[in-house]
Amino acid sequence: TENYRMGQRAYSLTPKCYGLMEYDRESVLRAAQAGNLNTLSMAESGILAVQGEPLNLTGKNVTIGFIDTGIRYQEDVLRDLAGRSRIVGIWDQTIQTGTPPEGFEYGSEYTNEMINEALVSDNPLGIVPSTDANGHGSVMASLAAGSPIENGSFTGAAPDCQIAVVKL
C-alpha cells in the first residue's frame, strides 16, 4: 500500500548513527555469504564507521550493564586479548548460597577476579556457578560488547568496554 511504501521511504531518509555513512556493501555481503556473521546491520547503523578512524569509538573506559537472563562468562567473545574476562562482576540473584553484594541481602556476587580464576580452572562452575541457560543475556552482551573474533567474522558494537551483569 501507499502508506507502507511511504513509511519505508521515510525510514530510508532517517540519518544513521553517525551521519550518512558510506560502506562497501559488497564486501559486507561477501563476508556474510562466506558463513561469517552478517555485519550488514552494524554497517548500516554506522557502528563499524565510528569504530574506525577518525573517531575510534570502541567502548574504551565505558562499562555496559546487562540486567537479563545471565551470561555465559566462559565465551571467548567476552574476554580481552590476553584471555582475561572483561566482565567486572556478576550479581546472580537466582543463587542464594554465595555472598551478596555489599548493601544487599540476596543473590551472589562474583567478581572479575573470581571469574578469571574460574576461566583457568578445570571446573569453572565450581568457582562461579552462574550460567545463562536461556542464552538471551549472553547474546545481548555479545552484540553490544563482544570482542573481535580471531578470524574477523564478528565484533560487538563496543568491543573494548567492560561488562557488568545482573542475572534475574
What label would you give each PLM region?
Residues 1-63, 70-86:
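Autoinhibitory propeptides
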